[in-house]
Amino acid sequence: MKRNYVLMLITVIISLIFIPYSVSANEGDVDFSIQALIPENQIDKKKTYFDLKMKPEQKQDIQLQVFNSSSKKITIEMDVTFATTNQNGLIDYTISDISKADESLRIPLPEITNISNREVVLQPGQSKIVTITITMPEEEYDGVILGAVHFKRN
């Protein structure tokens, strides 16, 4: 009897290890896409994100193309956030409260950017170009100002 119990337990353990199971996740309704329109002062033009070389007090417009791939009219909200480091030491681009930022953050990206229109309304199949203005501070900055543009469907 004890031998049957041990044999059954070993069979269950082996089954759990070797029988594949599938996990799926629903991405939701991602019915729009974003493409960065890379400017001339891009450091590496092969990158699909902005990596710009800018001078003190330089003002520059960056542009992103937003495309509605759905069959419905959609409204998209935009916001700029600064990058932080999570508990694992990885870069985190989630929207954070700037008042809780680490004191070592000298130039938060949201403070040097301006989005003239934070909402974009797109008809089905329509694309629009949105513009974000970056104004560098007066003093020269030897480093990287890291952040992200968040897009959220309303």
Provide a role label for each language-model segment.
Residues 2-25:
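Sec-dependent N-terminal signal peptides of Gram-positive bacterial secreted proteins and lipoproteins
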Residues 24-154:
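Long beta-sheet-rich domains in secretory-pathway and surface-associated proteins
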